[in-house]
Amino acid sequence: MKFINLVLCCFFFIIFFLSKPSLHASPPQPSINPRLFNAFIALQAWKHVITSDPRNFTKDWYGYNVCNYTGVYCAPAPDNPNITTVAGIDLNHANISGYLPEDLGLLTDLAVFHINSNRFLGTIPKSFSKLRVLYELDVSNNLLCGKFPSVVLSLPSLKFLDIRYNQLEGNVPSRLWDRKLDALFINNNNFQFAWPKNLGKSPVSALVMANIKVTGCIPSSIANMSKSLNEIILMNASLSGCLPQELGLLKNVRVFDVSFNNLVGELPETIGGMKKLEHINVAHNKLSGEIPASICSLPKLENFTYSYNYFCSEPNICLKLKDKDDKKNCIPHRPSQRSVNEYAYIDFDYVVLLRD
């Protein structure tokens, strides 16, 4: 009898043990849609290659509810409003160190990707080519390196591209200017390229190419951008030659900065046709001749900086501007001009200096 009781006891113990869930069993599948599950995989892979997060932006990046992650924004999918998906990532000014993994290509519904002012290394993954609805891409002020990220040329919905303040180098593909971008910022990199022949095809409103090397003269085809262009920043871009007369056709430009270059010749009088111009800076070039009165007569002009050139005359109307800088030129009877020992011959096309 004792033996039978022992057998029954062991039998029921085994049944009870087998009926309990194993501690080593696979976890149940999450009750989320496949797109959010892919987002979970992508974001966990990204978190795995983040080496420093001093402001704890990714501290709450755990669990399947990715819509509650800091910096992650969800919305109805563009192709199916009944499905929630990750539509945006904003980690601006987080000071995060790490890399961008290929797994980010799983975020196929991503429309906005902002990670400016961090310390991300490496390159933009080729898997970004899967982000067919990506509208804004801002990876500025990081430590990205290598050649121009050509993967951005394959993004059909991209309108805003900001890759400035990185360590990118080499040529900028001419195909970039065929893209229908609203804004383009490629400044403060190590790019070196010639002005593209198809520049005028670009519909950008902001053309910012400061602190890079662009060889040659500004092409006259820039006039073809007159409908969209309202800001031109070409400071310290290794520009040479003369400014084209066609600049006067840019009726919507408000800011024009070509300072710290090697431009020569006269300022085109046609700039007086840029009726919406508010700020113009041509300082630190080798421009000469007379300042056109048409520029100083612009109705919305607030600031005109033409210091450190070789202008020899300025009309009285320029003296009436509230905010102007004409120092270090060759203008008679004006203060803080160049000494006679700094120049010997000034022509409309070139300047010969006697001393540095």
What are these regions (language model features)?
Residues 2-76, 344-354:
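Surface-exposed cap/linker segments adjacent to membranes
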Residues 77-127:
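LRR N-terminal entry segment and analogous cap-like coil->beta motifs
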Residues 83, 105-110, 129-134, 153-158, ...:
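Leucine-rich repeat
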Residues 94, 115-118, 139-142, 163-166, ...:
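Consensus "Asn ladder" position of solenoid repeat domains
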Residues 100-105, 124-126, 145-150, 169-174, ...:
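The feature encodes a structural signal of leucine-rich repeats
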Residues 112-165:
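Right-handed parallel beta-helix
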Residues 274, 278-288, 293-354:
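Leucine-rich repeat domain C-terminal region
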